[in-house]
């Protein structure tokens, strides 16, 4: 018998939506553009964009995503533009208004989206002692695009504080997001970020988001894997650029960039057909646009989600996933060891994930059991789910959630 762990859970290509630059009520990029224009001489339209994104819109957006099954990652910048910490009263809002947004986030966003910081401010690098900018021109994405590798403790503490603020606000993070170019070299960044998240949440397999690949294959890298400890740092890579209004809120909005009306063109069909994770990057500002009647990015997303559903109406080929589901599965797959006999497969699984999916060949199973518990046979891809197996040609697909590190599968 030969056995392999398939690249994706249930052998379905994951779809996922990354939402960047979001935070509690504040339009972070109003302040970003206002404060950055004098430094670099750009003429970004900061006076045209809203200062606040209302809770009502955020709730509507989250409820629509839940109804459509859309999942992904939602940034919450912990100290947006250095205005104040979200686990303390922000100067622009009353405590009731702020707590209402946080409660809405916990109830409506968290069930379907991982929460991550997008580092501390998404603008100035702050002095951790004073919580004031270190220097006017030292920004997280310019200056700390190359992290000070000789100050690993400082970088780890900086990221850990970002995570701690979210946890204090009732939003424990699953990983971290880079603001702009923040976070080189990657191996150093991955090590610091992993230590920071684990310090706050204890998560053995967090992840980071930094890179975007708009052409070619999409990987799901695993950093600093330790089989003995069962720890690793995952990385999610976006497969698209942003055509949902971008970070300004007044950028391009184009559904056809993602998937055309005939369901054949655009970036996403190519990614899906290649079997790669179809991860869309977006920015919260673009979904809302310049005002409540704009919603340019939200309209694009609604069109794209509808087209993706029409392309796979039975859900046999794709499945919406949170980013952390994708990266943790990649960690589990990379760190697993399989030892196959004639009718017995022994798995050593330092990281255990739901819906672990195997392909078996060279054997005709009479039945399939995991640790003595029989799995249910199904006849179609649409019915293939956790706790089942499916004969397909000369192979058998098996999906189950392992309960322990040493797991035995018999056929």
Residue ranges of model-derived segments:
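C-terminal domain-boundary segment and adjacent tail
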Residues: 1, 7, 197-223, 261-352, ...
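N-terminal regions that are enriched for targeting/export leaders
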Residues: 1-72
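A cross-domain feature marking catalytic cores of carbohydrate-active enzymes
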Residues: 19-21, 74-78, 117-121, 177-180, ...
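A solvent-exposed, charged loop/short amphipathic helix patch at secondary-structure junctions
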Residues: 26-50, 132-149, 298-302
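Aromatic- and glycine-enriched glycan-recognition loops and surfaces
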Residues: 42-69, 90-109, 154-161
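Active-site-adjacent pocket scaffolds in enzyme catalytic domains
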Residues: 1-9, 16, 22, 28, ...
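Acidic-and-aromatic substrate-binding clefts and catalytic sites of carbohydrate-active enzymes
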Residues: 49-56, 79-100, 123, 127, ...
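C-terminal beta-sandwich/jelly-roll accessory domains of carbohydrate-active enzymes
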Residues: 323, 332-411
């Amino acid at each position: 018998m030969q056995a392999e762990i398939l690249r994706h859970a249930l052998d379905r290509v994951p779809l996922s939506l990354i939402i960047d630059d979001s935070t509690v009520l504040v339009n972070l990029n109003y302040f970003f553009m206002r404060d950055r224009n004098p430094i670099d001489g750009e003429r970004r339209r900061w006076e045209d964009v809203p200062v606040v994104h209302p809770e009502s819109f955020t709730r509507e957006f989250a409820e629509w995503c839940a109804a459509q099954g859309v999942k992904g990652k939602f940034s919450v910048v912990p100290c947006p533009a250095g205005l104040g910490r979200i686990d303390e009263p922000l100067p622009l809002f009353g405590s009731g208004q702020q707590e209402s947004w946080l409660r809405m986030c916990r109830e409506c966003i968290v069930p379907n989206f991982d929460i991550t910081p997008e580092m501390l401010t998404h603008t100035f690098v702050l002095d951790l002692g004073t919580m004031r900018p270190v220097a006017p021109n030292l920004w997280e994405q310019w200056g700390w695009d190359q992290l000070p590798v000789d100050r690993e403790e400082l970088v780890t503490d900086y990221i850990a504080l970002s995570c701690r603020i979210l946890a204090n606000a009732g939003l424990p993070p699953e990983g971290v997001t880079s603001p702009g170019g923040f976070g080189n070299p990657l191996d150093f960044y991955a090590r610091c970020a992993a230590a920071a998240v684990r310090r706050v949440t204890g998560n053995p397999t967090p992840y980071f988001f930094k890179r975007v690949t708009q052409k070619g294959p999409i990987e799901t890298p695993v950093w600093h894997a330790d089989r003995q400890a069962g720890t690793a740092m995952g990385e999610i890579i976006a497969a698209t650029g942003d055509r949902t209004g971008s970070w300004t809120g007044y950028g391009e909005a184009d559904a056809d960039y993602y998937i055309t009306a005939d369901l054949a063109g655009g970036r996403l069909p190519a990614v899906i057909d290649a079997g790669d994770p179809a991860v869309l990057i977006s920015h919260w500002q673009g979904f809302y646009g310049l005002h409540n009647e704009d919603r340019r990015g939200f309209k694009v997303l609604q069109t794209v989600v509808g087209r993706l559903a029409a392309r796979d109406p039975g859900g046999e080929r794709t499945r919406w996933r949170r980013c952390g589901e994708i990266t943790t599965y990649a960690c589990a797959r990379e760190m697993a060891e399989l030892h196959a006999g004639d009718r017995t497969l022994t798995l050593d699984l330092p990281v255990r994930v739901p819906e672990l999916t195997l392909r078996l060949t060279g054997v005709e199973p009479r039945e399939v059991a995991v640790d003595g518990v029989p799995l249910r046979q199904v006849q179609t891809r649409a019915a293939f789910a956790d706790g089942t197996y499916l004969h397909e040609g000369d192979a058998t697909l098996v999906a189950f959630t392992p309960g322990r590190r040493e797991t035995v599968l018999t056929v």
